[in-house]
């Protein structure tokens, strides 16, 4: 289950626009991840209060309209790392599966989850679902 740890109360729209600017010229179908170095440098100063610790890895996870991230386990996760998700954009038709439980997350919410448990996401809505994903230790 994703566990709520806080809320980002600042302006979300500039962060969403920044996320779109980092997306390579993709077809905007299915899902994509952006592992650009600039993700951490651009977002860490904003979220350091909510997500403390050393940012080991950060990336954007985007699911386009009618896209899915199939059930999986992140086997490349460091044992000492903690994974947080910042929901930059979502809609009422986005659902998250974690360890057998489905739930919906809220825009601006910051959540922790265990990536070593089976998880997946679907976006049946019309807009994109964008998360900033941060691993800390």
Question: Which sequence ranges carry the predicted segments?
Answer:
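A short hydrophobic beta-strand segment most commonly corresponding to one strand
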Residues: 82-87, 110-112, 126-137
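Tight coil/turn sites that cap or link beta-strands
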Residues: 65-67, 107-108, 116
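Short beta-strand His + acidic residue motifs that chelate non-heme Fe in jelly-roll/DSBH
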Residues: 70-72, 94-96, 113-114, 118-126, ...
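A short beta-strand-loop-beta hairpin characteristic of the jelly-roll/cupin
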Residues: 87-107
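A short glycine-rich, His/Asp/Glu-containing loop-to-beta-strand
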Residues: 47-68
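A short beta-loop-beta micro-motif enriched in histidine and acidic residues
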Residues: 55-56, 69-83
């Amino acid at each position: 289950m994703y566990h709520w740890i806080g809320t980002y109360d600042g302006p979300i729209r500039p962060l969403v626009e920044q996320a779109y600017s980092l997306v390579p010229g993709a077809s905007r179908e299915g899902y994509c991840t952006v592992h650009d170095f600039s993700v951490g440098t651009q977002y860490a100063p904003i979220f350091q209060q909510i997500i403390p610790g050393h940012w080991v890895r950060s990336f954007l996870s985007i699911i386009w309209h009618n896209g899915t991230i199939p059930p999986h386990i992140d086997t490349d996760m460091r044992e000492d790392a903690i994974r947080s998700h910042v929901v930059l954009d979502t809609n009422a038709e986005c659902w998250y599966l974690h360890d057998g439980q489905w739930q919906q997350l809220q825009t601006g919410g910051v959540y922790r989850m265990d990536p070593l448990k089976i998880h997946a996401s679907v976006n049946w809505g019309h807009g994109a679902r964008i998360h900033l994903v941060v691993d800390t230790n």
